[in-house]
Each structure stands twice: as C-alpha cells, then as structure tokens.
UniProtKB/Swiss-Prot annotation:
Enzyme Commission number: 4.2.1.9
Reactions the enzyme catalyzes: (2R)-2,3-dihydroxy-3-methylbutanoate = 3-methyl-2-oxobutanoate + H2O; (2R,3R)-2,3-dihydroxy-3-methylpentanoate = (S)-3-methyl-2-oxopentanoate + H2O
Positions of [2Fe-2S] cluster binding: C122, C193
The organism of origin for this protein: Pseudomonas fluorescens (strain ATCC BAA-477 / NRRL B-23932 / Pf-5)
Entry keyword Zinc-finger: no
Assigned keywords, A-Z: 2Fe-2S, Amino-acid biosynthesis, Branched-chain amino acid biosynthesis, Iron, Iron-sulfur, Lyase, Magnesium, Metal-binding
Pfam families: ILV_EDD_C (PF24877), ILVD_EDD_N (PF00920)
Name assigned to this protein: Dihydroxy-acid dehydratase
A GO term for molecular function: 2 iron, 2 sulfur cluster binding
Cofactor(s) listed in the protein's UniProt record: [2Fe-2S] cluster; Mg(2+)
Family indicated by similarity: Belongs to the IlvD/Edd family.
C-alpha cells in the first residue's frame, strides 16, 4: 500500500520543525495519522462565478474533518474573461490557465498533500485545476460554484445573458434606456454565466470525465441543493483516500478515471450539447498533462457521428443551464448517448463503480428515485443575489420530453452531426474549430473574400466603420497563443457583426479563439498560427476562401505556387504583424509566448523545448 505523501513532512525526527509548523496551523497529534487534503479554492471578488466561494472551502473542510481527514485550504487566481475582454486584459486570460495549474502543483507538492478538492467555476479555472490534477495524479474531486440564473426583463421574451447585453449595446438603433435595462438584467446572480459558455461547458465535462458528482455542471449557484454537492465532495475525497492509501486501489486516481476513453466521453458530451470551442483547447491541454494521445483527429472522428442532443444559449435563446438541469442535467444527456451506443459506460467515476451505474442512478428517464427527481426540479428564484445556496425554488415538473424538450433523444436529435466540427485545409494544415451549433445551415458552405485584420482591435474598428461587407470573410491573425500573445477571445468582433446585421452574411476566421458566448460562422484555433508560420499569415485582402463544413474543409483558393512565393517573402519579413499594435507585452506575457504551442496542441507549453534546456 502506498504511504501518505504527507508522511514526508509529518514523520521522523528530522521533521520536527515541519511538525511544529503544522501544529501552528492547528494540527494535533492524531492528525498526523490522517490524510492531509488540499482544498484548492478560487474565491475572488472580481468574478461573479467566484464571488460566492469565500466560505465554501471551509464548508468542505469541516466535512473532510468529520469524515476523518485533515483539510488545508489555499486559493488560486481567477480571471473574468468578460471583464478582461475588449482590452489588453484579455492577453492574460489563457496564460492564467497555466498559472493556475502551476499554483496548484506548487502548493500540493510543496506541502506533500495526499489529495485535492478543486473548487473551481469559470473559464480558465476549471481547466487549470484539471491540468494540475492530471499532472499530480493523486485522489481528486471537482466541485464548482455552479451556473448563474438567467436574467429576466420585460423588454425580452426570453432569458438574458451576458451576450445579450453586449449585442444590444453594439446596436446603434437601441436606446440608452434599453441598453441600461439589458445591462442591469443580464447577470442577476452569482455563478458562471447562464448559457452553455466555456465555464459551464467545462464544469459539465468534469462529470463526463468522472471527476465530479452528478449535478456539478447544472445545479444553480444560488440553489440550496448545491450545498449538498460541496458536503458530499468532502466526504467522497476521504473515501477516495482510504481506497487508494488504505486499500491500494489505483482505480481512484485521476489518470485511471480520466483515461483515453473518458476523454472520448467528455468530447462526445461536448459535441452533443454544443459546448464552447474553448473546451477543445482545454481538453487537448488536459490530455497532454495526463500523457494521453488524444488530439484533434480524435475530435474530428467523434464530431462526424455524434448528434446534437441539446441546444442552450448562445445557440438558442429558449434554454439556459437552469433548463438543462430541469431536463435531468448532464447524466440525462449521457444516458441518451449511452442508449445510442455512443458512450463508454464501463469506466470508473469518483461516485460510482462505473459510468453505467451512475447513469442508472441519476438519469431521470431511467430511475424512479423520487430524491433524484426532486433534485432536478431545483430552479431559479429570479432574485438578484451574490449569496450561495440562498433559495430553494423548485419547478412543478421535470422536462422529460425527449422529442421536443431541452434534451433530445438520439432519434429526435437537433441534428445528426453534433455542435462542434474540426476543419482542415491549406489555410489550417493542423486544423481549426467551428461551433456548428451556432451556425445557420444556410451558410454551412460559404465562399467569400478575405478581409484582413492584424489584431482584434483593428477588426473591431473596421467592423464598426462599415469596412466589412456582406460576403466577406473577416480574418484576424497574429492573435494566437504565441502571436497575441495569449490567444484572445473574439467575442466583440462577432457581437458587432451581429449588431450590423452581418451574422449570417459574413464569416470570421482567426488563430485566436472565441468566447463560449459566440455564435455564427466563427472559426477559431487556426493552426499553425500566423506567428508560427501558418498559412493564415499569407492570406491577402480579396483572396477567395471556401469554407465547407459538411466536408470538414477550409481552403484558401490560391495556387500552391503563389503560396510558396508568398512564404519566401514572408520568411524575409518575419512572421509578425505589418501594423504596429498599441499593446503592452510584459515580461510575463513574453515568457508565456516563448513556450506556447499552437491551438491544435491545446496551447500548452512546448515540452520538447523545455526538455532540451
């Protein structure tokens, strides 16, 4: 049986000094015989998805100690992508993922912790903690802060979210009063933004990976039911410690739970629910940390036969995360996928021996357990608040309509192919990604003229100045992981295209990425990126580009000979923007850019370069 890692700092005469310091934190003699469990919290008052987490770490800590463990809490950073968007703050968003992963590794390894509870929620925090968990490979469980309630206003017939506020603000025909009403109504409570944006997508995927409890991705941050998820996480992590350290059961380790098949399950769910394209970036990064050979080709393969079973904002205005929960949450989507033969159900999870057992217990269409049905009736209260577990509202009934409801069966899918696709061609030799769930079928094949912008800022200026016309393909380059640096999200350009009435009349291609709130023919993650010598850096204004989603292709309609000649010239000039960009690239960002790989590798650090040092 493996020894507790913590024995390194708690046992032996030579550790008297370390024990003295542990005692100063409150530990007693008996505590040195127990597992020391790290609680990686991410409370911050900057982010609505994290503003309510302050006391939740100690809630989990008390439950860990009741169950026989020793809990020690620390915090990571958390960047709000929505607040950082539209200025140089967005340069820091993706790099913060690596900082979060490193900080968890640093704290856990420096103090020899035996296990981790990851309290995450928003865009880069869940991925960063996931990367750390797979790096460390010690018992772990994820419990996130939960989604925000959808906003309500008399001016809209549907629930509101952050994207609605951004789009209406960019609409010159909207009055200041209407804009203000949307702004005040779009984000009414604590929690991660209410649609299937990046944060909620990632928290749902932790369920599919087997590293979180059922309901983690869909139970509202404000609902009292979410408290039990935190308490149960505290009890479960102690059980996982006992199984690993006491019973030598390696099946509880994250790399044995989140193995290749589990990554296929997570991606299958992502495609079926029309998740954010950012999830692809983060799953690829997490797979690299786990030393799993899971790449864009695997995602491409899955995307061709997994149907879309769920449509949620921003892909449709009718449904938000609260509606997904009412329809049975993630385990109901997993149940439909399993019935369609599209899921590996023989894999272990942190809460059940196999995924099949978990589905049987938690899929509302399979179980008659009234407690489970009661759990998924948890709904929104419609009361603005920043307090967790502050309401206990319940729907009168569940949405178990698998023909026309929020979650569909395979037979009644929204589309036979899922909500994400990988495209290849001469403009993206290593692939690029499009969220097909948000693309109107009328423009699944689109040929247009390239309109080049060498930064997001210049693209925004060009769109607002009406430089972009119907039929154009907006190309924003040198915004990749290395070229940005930091791979900015392009939510403002896509929102402004919508506000100009060009949402279905134009396309956008970038080596940057998109917010989970993006919809329309928006293609990101073009790899290799321009700064790494990618073909996207060779496109010229007016070049024809053909996008063909059904055939998974994207090509610059320029001869190979012409491209070769352009490459020779670009090599002489250097792969950098032609125009000067008024952005301050600090030492921290330069360090990130130096090691960053392109998006097809998850924008992780270039380990081959590091190994050569």
């Amino acid at each position: 049986m493996p020894d507790y890692r913590s024995k390194t700092s708690t046992h032996g005469r030579n550790m008297a000094g370390a024990r003295a310091l542990w005692r100063a934190t409150g530990m007693k003699d008996d505590d040195f015989k127990k597992p020391i469990i790290a609680i990686a919290n991410s409370f911050t008052q900057f982010v609505p998805g994290h503003v309510h987490l302050k006391d939740l770490g100690q809630l989990v800590a008390r439950e860990i100690e009741r169950a026989g463990g020793v809990a020690k809490e620390f915090n990571t950073i958390a960047v709000d992508d929505g607040i950082a968007m539209g200025h140089d703050g967005m340069l820091y968003s993706l790099p913060s993922r690596e900082i979060i992963a490193d900080s968890v590794e640093y704290m856990v390894n420096a103090h020899c912790a035996d296990a981790i509870v990851c309290i995450s929620n928003c865009d880069k925090i869940t991925p960063g903690m996931l990367m750390a968990a797979l790096r460390l490979n010690i018992p772990v469980i994820f419990v996130s802060g939960g989604p925000m309630e959808a906003g309500k206003t008399k001016l809209a017939s549907h629930g509101l979210d952050l994207v609605d506020a951004m789009v209406i603000a960019a609409d010159s025909s909207a009055s200041d009063e209407k804009v203000a009403e949307y702004e005040r109504s779009a984000c009414p409570t604590c929690g991660s933004c209410s649609g299937m944006f990046t944060a909620n997508s990632m928290n749902c995927l932790t369920e599919a990976l087997g590293l979180a409890l059922p309901g983690n991705g869909s139970t509202l941050a404000t609902h009292s039911d979410r408290e039990e998820l935190f308490l149960r996480a505290g009890r479960t992590i102690v059980e996982l410690c006992q199984r690993y350290y006491g019973d030598n059961d390696e099946s509880v380790l994250p790399r044995n739970i989140a193995n290749f098949k589990a990554f296929e399950n997570a991606m299958t769910l992502d495609i079926a629910m029309g998740g954010s394209t950012n999830t692809i970036l983060h799953l690829l990064a997490a797979a690299q940390e786990a030393e799993i050979d899971f790449d864009l080709r695997d995602i491409d393969r899955l995307s061709r036969h997994v149907p879309q079973l769920c449509k949620v904002a921003p892909n449709i205005q009718k449904y938000h995360m609260e509606d997904v929960h009412r329809a049975g949450g993630i385990f109901s989507i997993l149940g439909e996928l399993a019935r369609g033969g599209l899921l590996h159900t023989d894999l272990p999870t942190v809460h059940s021996k196999t995924m099949a057992e978990g589905i049987a217990q938690w899929d509302i269409t399979q179980t008659s357990d009234e407690a489970v049905h009661h759990f998924f009736k948890a709904g929104p209260a419609g009361i603005p608040t920043q307090t967790a577990f502050s309401q206990s509202t319940r729907w009168d009934s569940l949405d178990d309509d698998r023909e026309n409801g929020c979650i569909r069966s395979v037979e009644h899918a929204y589309s036979k192919e899922g909500g994400l696709a990988v495209l290849y061609g001469n403009i993206a030799l290593d692939g690029c990604v499009v969220k097909t769930a948000g693309v109107d079928e009328s423009i699944h094949v689109f040929e247009g003229n390239a309109k080049i912008f060498e930064s997001q800022d210049s693209a925004v200026r060009g769109i607002l100045a009406d430089e972009v016309k119907e039929g154009d393909i907006v190309i924003i380059r040198y915004e990749g992981p290395k070229g940005g640096p930091g791979m900015q999200e392009m939510l403002y350009p896509t929102s402004y295209l919508k506000s100009k009435g060009l949402g279905k009349a134009c396309a956008l291609l970038t080596d940057g990425r998109f917010s989970g709130g993006t919809s329309g023919l928006s293609i990101g993650h073009a790899s290799p990126e321009a700064a790494a010598g990618g073909t996207i850096g060779l496109v010229q204004d007016g070049d024809k580009v053909l996008i063909d989603i059904p055939n998974r292709s994207i090509n610059l309609l320029v001869s190979d000979e012409e491209l070769a000649a352009r490459r020779v010239e670009q090599d002489k000039k250097g792969w950098k923007p032609v125009e000067a960009r008024p952005r301050k690239v600090t030492t921290a960002l330069k360090a990130y850019a130096l090691l960053a790989t392109s998006a097809d590798k998850g924008a992780v650090r270039n380990k081959a370069m590091l190994d050569g040092l």
